[in-house]
């Protein structure tokens, strides 16, 4: 274990030469990426409950997204982690949240040192919900309640929506890009500013900042969008969750806007056979892509993109200037 100083914090890192990807990308390189992207990434994860996907043994060879649509199965040896692990440093922010699974003691990434600490635990993927912790008011023992069916004055609120585009069997990220362009036109017509992001796999997410709203209302908006797209373009979009019906079509996974769900954070790495990153992109890049490789970005690519273009997801950080969620 080697002690390092990060932003005034002292923490230990280990096994820096250990490959975490089949091609040899090491833990040290993962840590370096998260340390260097932190200033750009942290505003998108700060004040949000963090779910981590850890790969302590590294990403197994042959780990790819399935060609069937739907949820990607966990790679052997990987696991999701919600509770703060044993040994969490005292300086790491934590927030207990009452969920259907019980009270979860979430980690919250507030500073670069937290991202470095998580990278040292081989937490390659970082997932966050669309609501923020500080918008709610904790109850007894500091526990925050998730939004339920009935509104309460203490529940946390969503400040963005995500349209998660899930391509069915036989489709790839180019199909997701085409779908994103169509969805963005609808969202812009509703007064929102759509922000596209590649998932680091076959999908694309379209985000938009919103004035604080109840998570069930954000979910209902994206569900309506799902139905509208399937009605307008039934040959390309499908409203059903059925894997069979989704073959060759795009499904808008509106359930990603539920309070209990989370999506891959902007600039998070992905646990795939090759190190890739969930990357904010421009609409011109989506429209002009001719190969899946045009929308696949490595950690080095992303760092270079940020140096050249800055944060392409900056419109998600509008705060009080965000548009109100369209009503039903």
Segments the model singles out, each with a brief description of its role:
Residues 37-184, 191, 245, 287-293, ...:
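Basic, nucleic-acid-interacting segments
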Residues 1-25, 29-32, 39-42, 46, ...:
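C-terminal accessory nucleic-acid interaction domains of nucleic acid-metabolism proteins
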Residues 207-218:
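Catalytic palm subdomain of template-directed nucleic-acid polymerases
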Residues 53-55, 194-200, 240-244:
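Short beta-strand
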Residues 198-208:
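Short, conserved phosphate-binding/catalytic loop or strand-edge motifs used
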Residues 20, 59-62, 73, 203-204, ...:
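Flexible loop/turn segments at secondary-structure boundaries
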Residues 175, 198-200, 217:
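Short, contiguous, pocket-lining structural segments
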């Amino acid at each position: 274990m080697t002690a390092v100083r990060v932003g005034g914090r002292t923490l230990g890192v280990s096994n820096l030469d250990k490959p975490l990807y089949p091609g040899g990308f090491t833990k040290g390189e993962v840590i370096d990426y998260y340390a260097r992207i932190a200033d750009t990434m942290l505003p998108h994860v700060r004040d949000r409950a963090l779910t981590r996907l850890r790969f302590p043994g590294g990403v197994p060879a042959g780990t790819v997204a399935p060609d069937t649509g739907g949820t990607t199965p966990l790679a052997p040896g990987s696991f999701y982690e919600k509770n703060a692990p044993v040994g969490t440093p005292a300086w790491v922010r934590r927030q207990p949240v009452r969920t259907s699974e019980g009270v979860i003691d979430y980690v919250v990434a507030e500073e670069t040192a937290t991202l470095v600490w998580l990278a040292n635990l081989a937490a390659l993927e970082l997932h966050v919900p669309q609501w923020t912790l500080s918008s709610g008011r904790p109850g007894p023992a500091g526990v925050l309640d998730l939004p339920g069916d009935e509104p309460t004055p203490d529940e946390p609120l969503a400040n963005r929506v995500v349209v998660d585009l899930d391509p069915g069997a036989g489709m790839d990220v180019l199909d997701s890009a085409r779908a994103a362009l169509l969805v963005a036109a609808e969202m812009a017509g509703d007064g929102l500013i759509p922000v596209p992001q590649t998932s680091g796999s076959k999908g694309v997410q379209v985000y938009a900042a919103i004035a604080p709203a109840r998570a069930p209302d954000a979910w209902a908006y994206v569900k309506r969008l799902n139905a509208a797209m399937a009605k307008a373009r039934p040959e390309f979009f499908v409203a059903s969750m059925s894997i069979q019906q989704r073959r060759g079509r795009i499904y808008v996974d509106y359930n990603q806007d539920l309070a209990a769900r989370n999506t891959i954070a902007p600039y998070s790495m992905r646990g795939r056979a090759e190190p890739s990153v969930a990357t904010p992109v421009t609409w011109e890049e989506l429209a002009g892509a001719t190969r899946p490789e045009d929308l696949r970005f490595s950690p080095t690519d992303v760092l270079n993109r940020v140096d050249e273009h800055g944060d392409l997801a900056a419109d998600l950080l509008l705060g009080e200037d965000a548009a109100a969620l369209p009503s039903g």
